[in-house]
Amino acid sequence: MKKKISLETLRDLGIDTELLMTKNRPEAVDLKTAVTEQLLRRGYSKASIARMLNQDHRIVDYYLRRHNDLFYTDRTYTGVHNLVRKCLTPQPPLP
């Protein structure tokens, strides 16, 4: 059974939710892109991700699995990787 995750829990995981919810700032766009790419790779639907990213500062019912693959290795995402590294804390893999 997957666990529902709130904005507070995302913050506890090290995700800069204030920046994530900011509009019209390049860093926010890059962070949203990085988070979206990670969640798409994990099989979440674009609609679910869009709902989560477009919420205000209310609690969000959202599923997020903790993995140790939070950082990109693809050179295409080098700039985003650097930003994400500052905003996210790697999590140990689930047993």
Task: For each feature predicted by the language model, list its residue ranges.
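Residue-level recognition of short, structured coil/turn motifs
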Residues: 14-15, 54, 72
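Short alpha-helical "recognition helix" segments of helix-turn-helix
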Residues: 47-52
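Short, amphipathic alpha-helical "recognition" segments used to contact nucleic acids or chromatin
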Residues: 27-44
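Short Lys/Arg-enriched helix C-cap and helix-to-coil transition segments
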Residues: 69-95
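Short, Lys/Arg-enriched anionic-surface-contact patches
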Residues: 2-32, 62
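Helix-turn-helix DNA-binding helix
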Residues: 56-61
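Amphipathic alpha-helical interaction surfaces
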Residues: 39-45, 66, 70-73
